[in-house]
Amino acid sequence: MKHRLKIASVIMGFCAIGSTAAMAANHKTPPWGPGPFKVLLEVNQNNRAEWAITINNLRTMERVVGMNTAHAEVLAWGPGIKFLLKNSPYASDIQSLSMYGIKFSACHQTMKAMHLKKAQLASGVTIVPGAIAEIIKRHNEGWTEIKE
C-alpha cells in the first residue's frame, strides 16, 4: 500500500507542477496533453486512508486537470464498497464530486454477497453488474486504471 501511496503522490505532484507551468505559459497545452483523460480509480479495501487519498486525488484532478477534459470513475468492490454507503464518512464527498461528473460505481456482485440494497448507497452512486467486468470494459475503452 505504501508503494501505491507514493505513486499516487508522485502523479499528483507532477500534475500540480505541470498546472503551474501551464498557467504561466498563458493557456498553452499543458504538459500532460490536451485530453480527454479517462481514469478509473479502483478501491477494494475498507481502509479510510485509501479512501481519503482517493477523494483527495479526485479533488486534485478536478482542480488541476479540470473535469472538462477528464472523465473519472471510482469503482468500489469487496470491503471497499462500505465507503459508498449513506452512512459513510465520505457520503457528502461522493455527492459533491458527482456534481462535477465524477462517477461512483458499486459492484452488484459485492452488494449481493454483503446483502446490501440500492437504498443503502449514498446519493450519486450507480451500480455496475460486476467489478471485474467494469474494469475490463473500461480498459478496452482506453481508460487508465489506478488501484488505490
Annotate each PLM feature.
Residues 1-10:
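Bacterial N-terminal signal peptides that target proteins for export
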Residues 10-19:
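Bacterial N-terminal signal peptides
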Residues 20-24:
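Sec/Tat signal peptide C-region and signal peptidase I cleavage site
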Residues 25-73, 83:
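N-terminal secretory signal peptides
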Residues 43, 76, 108:
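A cross-domain feature marking catalytic cores of carbohydrate-active enzymes
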Residues 45, 79-81, 111:
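Short, glycine/serine-rich, charged loops/turns that create anion-binding
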Residues 63-99, 104-105:
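Mature extracytoplasmic domains of secretory-pathway proteins
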Residues 87-148:
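A cross-taxonomic marker for long C-terminal extensions/tails that follow the last structured domain
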